[in-house]
A protein has these predicted regions:
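Conserved structured core elements
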Residues: 11, 29, 46, 50, ...
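Terminal amphipathic helices with adjacent charged low-complexity linkers/tails
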Residues: 52, 61-63, 74, 140-146, ...
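Glycine-rich, charged/polar anion/phosphate-binding loops
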Residues: 16-22, 183-187, 254-257, 304-307
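Buried hydrophobic positions in well-ordered alpha/beta secondary-structure cores of metabolic enzymes
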Residues: 33-35, 119, 200, 265, ...
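Flexible, glycine/charged-enriched surface loops at secondary-structure junctions
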Residues: 1-4, 27-28, 64-72, 171-177, ...
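Long, structured ligand/cofactor-binding scaffold of large enzymes
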Residues: 25-140
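Active-site cavity-forming subdomains of large catalytic enzyme subunits
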Residues: 89-253, 258, 263
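N-terminal amphipathic/basic leader segments beginning at the initiator methionine
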Residues: 1-30
Length: 317
């Protein structure tokens, strides 16, 4: 008997409350899957995630499950630059992780699918998956499309500010950077923390192969989301949990990938935090041990030339 059905036998009010939320009697007999994202108007990496979760739900329905939707909006490192908002950014990782734990624990879900795109929400979700330890799949929210001349939000922010201080840029040029720096939804299109952590989710085995850094406006993102919905039902059936996937070798593999793609140094903060949720110690010296042995083959901005969607088109992780 699945976990949710066992608990339902103990407390009739549980069924009554779900029926009052729009579920029917057939729904409450099915495997119940938490579908949680960080959808909101906070930044381009999250504004489309409700559509991703809808596709996840379709996949769950296809395989005989019942999804339940929850949202905890994240905040953006870029929006927090240059003022006291930056003091809140790392703390938001813990808040999001804690909220997922609460949502996943207050009813006996049989599995969960989490979706996010960016710097602190992805490690928050990966930490939560490890902490809650029920069958789980992560769906990365994909990459933003590049602007004209490969413009990125990094150009619009950091580079234009430096040029302005040197009086080497006109107001019209700054305006152009602003208007072309973020031309679509998705994570910023360079190998910052957001793109790095999408890659780490896939390298760890918590996201489907090929799903990190999908161009966020392409239908492929919807296909991966629907496939994740189907996959979680198989994981529930086989009771495969994050603790079965997040082995010491999985973390070592992630560090190897991190080195090869020139990943953000924030990986040194987030990967050990994920491991700690499982009682593992991920010594920072392991990064020092692995990095000199792994060639930097990912020619990806800012340590290389190309933007993240080019990396995905070339084969990705």
């Amino acid at each position: 008997m699945i976990r949710s059905s066992k608990e339902r036998l103990l407390w009739a009010q549980f069924d009554a409350l779900q029926l009052g939320s729009g579920w029917d009697e057939e729904d409450i007999e099915k495997p119940q899957i938490l579908v949680e994202d960080v959808f909101g108007d906070s930044h381009p990496g999250s504004v489309h995630l409700n559509q991703v979760s809808e596709q996840v739900a379709y996949g769950i329905y296809e395989k005989g499950g019942k999804p339940g939707h929850f949202h905890v909006t994240d905040i953006c490192d870029g929006c927090a630059q240059g003022h006291d908002g930056m003091n809140l950014i790392l703390a938001s990782r813990e808040v999001i992780c804690d909220m997922v734990e609460m949502h996943a624990g207050y009813v006996p879900w049989d599995g969960m699918v989490l979706s996010s795109s960016c710097d602190k929400s992805i490690p928050a979700h990966l930490k939560a998956m490890a902490r809650v330890n029920i069958p789980a799949v992560f769906v990365p929210g994909g990459s933003m499309r590049p602007g004209p001349n490969q413009t990125t939000s990094l150009v619009a922010g950091d580079i234009s500010l430096r040029q302005k201080r040197k009086d080497a840029i006109t107001p019209a040029e700054i305006r152009n950077y602003k208007r072309t720096g973020c031309p679509s939804v998705g994570a910023c299109t360079f190998m910052g923390t957001a793109s790095t952590m999408q890659c780490m989710a896939e390298a760890l085995g918590l996201a489907l192969p090929g799903s990190a850094l999908v161009p966020a406006t392409m239908s492929e993102l919807q296909f991966f989301a629907r496939r994740a919905g189907r996959t979680i039902m198989e994981l529930v059936r086989r009771n495969i949990r994050p603790i079965d996937i997040l082995t010491p070798q999985a973390f070592r593999n992630a560090i190897i990938v991190h080195s090869a793609i020139g990943g953000s140094t924030n990986g040194l903060i987030h990967l050990p935090a994920i491991a700690k949720e499982l009682g593992m110690e991920l010594d920072p010296e392991l990064f020092n041990e692995i990095n000199p042995k792994i060639p930097h083959i990912g020619n990806i901005n800012p340590s290389g030339k190309h933007l993240t969607e080019s990396f995905w088109f070339a084969g990705g992780i």
